[in-house]
């Protein structure tokens, strides 16, 4: 392999693409003493920006509810990055974008969620680390109709 054909990966820019926070039952919700049920959803999307430049967006949605229908808060962060990815075989490009890039973006999204929730008057939410490789394998297995155990 020549020097020009070496795989190349670099971070060009990391930014918040979208951030929303809803506290629909304020101020009465602050009087509640029950511990809310927390739900976390993740979604990763990748798009081509230019030749060798890709935008990856990791969307983290965290909702807190009391009982089945009383919303405490809903926060959604779309943490994005522009990555330069060159000389990577086509079969390896998707795993880089769906595993490697989200691993880089997740700490930024986690901090944005925690900051938004605490600024809304609640205890900060600390999201647990995510195994993006296992999520990717699960999604691939679902596409192919197979089963993969998540560890």
From Swiss-Prot:
A cellular component annotation (GO) from this entry: cytoplasm
Disulfide bond entries: none
Pfam families: SecB
Cross-referenced PANTHER family: PROTEIN-EXPORT PROTEIN SECB (PTHR36918:SF1), PTHR36918
Role according to the record: One of the proteins required for the normal export of preproteins out of the cell cytoplasm. It is a molecular chaperone that binds to a subset of precursor proteins, maintaining them in a translocation-competent state. It also specifically binds to its receptor SecA.
Complex formation: Homotetramer, a dimer of dimers. One homotetramer interacts with 1 SecA dimer.
Family that this chain belongs to: Belongs to the SecB family.
NCBIfam families: PRK05751.1-3 (NF004392), PRK05751.1-5 (NF004394), secB (TIGR00809)
Protein name as annotated: Protein-export protein SecB
Organism: Azoarcus sp. (strain BH72)
């Amino acid at each position: 392999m020549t020097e020009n054909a070496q795989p190349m990966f670099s971070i060009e820019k990391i930014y918040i693409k979208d951030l929303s926070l809803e506290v629909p039952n304020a101020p009465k919700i602050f009087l509640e003493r029950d511990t809310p049920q927390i739900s976390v959803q993740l979604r990763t999307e990748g798009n081509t920006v230019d030749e060798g430049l890709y935008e990856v967006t990791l969307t983290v949605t965290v909702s807190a509810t009391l009982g089945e229908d009383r919303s405490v808060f809903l926060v959604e962060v779309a943490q994005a990055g522009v990555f330069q990815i060159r000389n990577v075989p086509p079969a390896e490009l998707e795993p880089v974008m769906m595993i490697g890039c989200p691993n880089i973006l997740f700490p930024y999204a986690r901090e944005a969620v925690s900051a938004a929730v605490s600024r809304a008057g609640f205890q900060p939410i600390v999201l647990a680390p995510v195994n993006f490789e296992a999520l990717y394998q699960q999604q691939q297995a679902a596409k192919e109709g197979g089963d993969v155990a998540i560890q």
